Amino acid sequence: MDSSGALEGSSPLPPRGVNPANFIIPPVEGIAGGGTGYGWADVGTESSNLCKGVNVIDPTQIPSAELLHVWCMPSTANVGQQEMPRPFDHVSLLAARNERESVQIALRPKLSWASSGLAGTVQIQCTDLCSASGDRLVFGQSLTMRHVVPILGVPDALVPLDLPIAQINLLPGETTSIWVSVDVPAGQPPGHYEGQILITALKANAEMSAQVLSKAEKYNLYRELKSCLEMVEPVGGKPLEEVAERLKSATSSLKRLLLWPVFQEFYKDNGSCDMMDEDAFTNISINMKFNVTVWDFTLPLTPSLPAVFGISETVIEDRFALEHGSEGWYDALDRHFKWLLQYRISPYFCRWGDSMRILAYTCPWPADHPRSEEYYSDPRLAAYAVPYAPILSCSNEARDSLRKDVEILKSKPHWRKAYFYLWDEPLNLDQYELIRSMSSDIRTYAPDARILTTYYCGPSDAHGSSTFEAFVKVPKYLRPHTQIFCTSEWVLGNREDLVNDITAELQPENGEEWWTYVCMGPSDPQPNWHLGMRGTQHRAVMWRVWKEGGTGFLYWGANCYEKSLVASAEIKFRRGLPPGDGVLFYPGEVFSPSHEPIASIRLERILSGMQDIEYLKLYSSRYSREEGLALLEKTGAYLSPERYTLEHTPIDLMRAEIYRTCGA
């Protein structure tokens, strides 16, 4: 599963403080290619035609709908650059509390209103979503927008846009997609929330650029507005005199803000605000209604299915030039850990040794460190990996470290989430013996410890090793030194009936579990997370897990791209692996100065699949698991590994039926 390649390179970045509308996202190379194959052109947005006296369309004088197509697409759609326009429609979503639901807004120019290789620049604004009772889903907090950027020509990277007003460049003859997500807080009141998205074609000249605030100015404006909010927000129960004083102070601050130069053009000589420009701006914009129904179901904070995903510590060390164990190293791991928790997955960091032995750990600090409990007790973790320190060294110090960690953790309520991952895909009896030996060490300190072992075949030097029967009999080689038997979905192929053969060999009464994983396989048309697969194919990985009855899931790597020693270097997938295999997010530095990772569309679809499991679990708890399976098939969402929906509608039907029967 793991290998390290080598690559050096870099991608052009905008200088700090430059408006993102003035540059185009650079190409990100995969196995090969790049350059103009990704629509890259090293140009800005200034129009040279204006200087030459050539007639240029003024987008402020005509409706934006005459300049560009706008339509919405579901989150399972792969909206490529050659995606053709669909009819305009409004957005209507259904979401539970503590759920993220996403949709795409596609933009394609009808003609060009700029020059220098661009079709034009578009501004996107979104209002808060409000309910009739006055509750809000706040734009910039619960609502976010990201630009879908192609990787190897396939839409995948989700690059955050500047908020509250985003600007993007459109290229002639190409479709661009914006990924809009709604994160519903766990405490959000149920109801129908309404808002709108305004999409407006802009002038691409120096005058427009001058109206954009610098980052420092934006921060000052943000600070002033936040101060006003803090003055008036906590007025409940306050004496009337204090409320009046707070309002007076806030009014004074707001009047001061309106005197900023950036607002001067909206004022007449008498100081009253001239709304004509605003009305004209709104009238030429494309107005897309954005509605979300929040229903009275809250996704559990702790995922029902433990889904453990690996993060290579060596990739982080190489790309960000971090010394193992340094302050920067701990900061980087901490940042990755916290960021990945939002996707309902339980991360573990890993370092690979010879013959596929692995050091896997969720917390980079020892169990007696003050920070460790913050990791292990996080309710968003469904499972955590405990490091087996002797895998790196058989020294007394390593054994003492293991003993100390286990003795501390086994006394905690969260110990039931703990597991040890020692070896990836053992291939022969010698490797099986090493697993048994390491497990014995661990069980000396904690007889109830759980050992996880992944495998796709029986030991090669055992009798009949090449047969499915040898694969099924693996538990007899590893019992009682493995409790979580994690098998490859590739072995099953399209034979769901083989699940019964696997589970029949297990002893759940003795704490044995069956988990699954995907890696290089299975391949198309079965569900996996390779780049270029259909969106429903990505989402169906978790449908398959739920239908087959696995109690957990493992994915070998989320950041295992080729080695580089430069943070902003272009991304290349590892040779020998299907594109996208082992890569679910990208370094933020590739796209901007930000250090925050960039999610892939595939990672968002993993989240959607994890959320679907919670919906199906709710339905099954009301009507039985058999009825849950019947719903999955009746709606046409998922029938088998090669028979699942290619369209999004059955997903909406399934979710709507669960909403209707369990919460409406």
Language model regions located:
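Surface-exposed binding patches on compact interaction domains or structured appendages
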Residues: 17-88, 110-179
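A short beta-strand micro-motif common to beta-rich folds, especially ectodomain repeats
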Residues: 191-202
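Contiguous beta-strand segments within globular domains
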Residues: 88-111
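Substrate-binding cleft of secreted/luminal carbohydrate-active enzymes
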Residues: 533-579
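Catalytic domains of carbohydrate-active enzymes that cleave complex glycans
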Residues: 374, 387-394, 398-431, 435, ...
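Active-site clefts of carbohydrate-active enzymes
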Residues: 509-535
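Short, surface-exposed loop/turn segments at beta-strand-coil junctions that are enriched for proline
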Residues: 183-190
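An acidic-aromatic substrate-binding cleft motif
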Residues: 277-390, 410-413
